[in-house]
């Protein structure tokens, strides 16, 4: 994989001004983004998140998933901490793309869960890859991470490229009546680490 750093700009947000670093995968044409806040240390653990693109959750406020809630909470946590990063990877629909994701949603509307829908379309449950994160982390100077995730595959991906995951910080937000079954499937079939309280009815 050939990841090329392109440019950096300021990104004002409701939580403060982040820096937005653009990267291009010259083999696939995919464009990825690293958001950083404050001064990042190469010696001390840095709060961060690997976030896969979710147009419906991140930009269209969908309640079918928890992605948008996780992104906003991660950005807020980073701003409150004073420093941190988000690697925003263009892997829509756990890697199957936007239109296939809509096809999968159609199957879910008919009763399939998120894993079954992917498989009925001929895809694995999760097609995401994380090999692009190494050059991105090298560019922003991060070697030790407090990783905001419920996904053990992301912890493994960090460790495999030599990044020390000092702490896994749970990110359990956004549960609602539209996504509760989806969250249960992520826990039971995709191995996401979520505590039982996340599935109890809210008052």
Swiss-Prot record:
**Residues holding GTP:** 49-53, 70, 92-94, 114, 149, 154
Is the keyword Nucleotide-binding assigned to this protein? yes
Task: Identify the CDD domains for this entry.
Answer: GTP_cyclohydro2 (cd00641)
Top enzyme class? hydrolase
Task: Name the active site residues.
Answer: 126, 128
Q: So what family is this one in?
A: Belongs to the GTP cyclohydrolase II family.
Report the protein name in the record. GTP cyclohydrolase-2
Origin species: Shewanella sp. (strain MR-4)
Mind giving the lineage of the organism this protein is from? Bacteria, Pseudomonadati, Pseudomonadota, Gammaproteobacteria, Alteromonadales
């Amino acid at each position: 994989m050939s990841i090329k750093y392109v440019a950096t700009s300021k990104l004002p947000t409701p939580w403060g001004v982040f820096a937005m670093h653009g990267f291009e995968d010259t083999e696939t044409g995919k464009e990825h983004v690293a958001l950083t806040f404050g001064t990042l240390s190469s010696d001390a653990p840095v709060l961060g998140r690997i976030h896969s693109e979710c147009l419906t959750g991140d930009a269209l406020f969908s309640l079918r998933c928890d992605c948008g809630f996780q992104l906003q909470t991660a950005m807020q946590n980073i701003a409150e901490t004073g420093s941190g990063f988000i690697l925003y990877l263009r892997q829509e629909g756990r890697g199957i793309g936007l239109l296939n994701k809509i096809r999968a949603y159609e199957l879910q509307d008919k009763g399939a869960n998120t894993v079954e829908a992917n498989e009925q379309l001929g895809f694995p449950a999760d097609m995401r890859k994380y090999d692009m994160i190494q050059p991105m982390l090298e560019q922003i100077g991060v070697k030790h991470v407090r990783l905001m995730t419920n996904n053990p595959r992301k912890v493994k991906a960090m460790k495999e490229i030599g990044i020390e995951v000092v702490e896994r910080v749970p990110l359990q937000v956004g549960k609602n009546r539209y996504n509760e079954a989806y969250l249960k499937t992520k826990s039971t079939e995709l191995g996401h680490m979520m505590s039982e309280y996340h599935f109890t009815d809210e008052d």
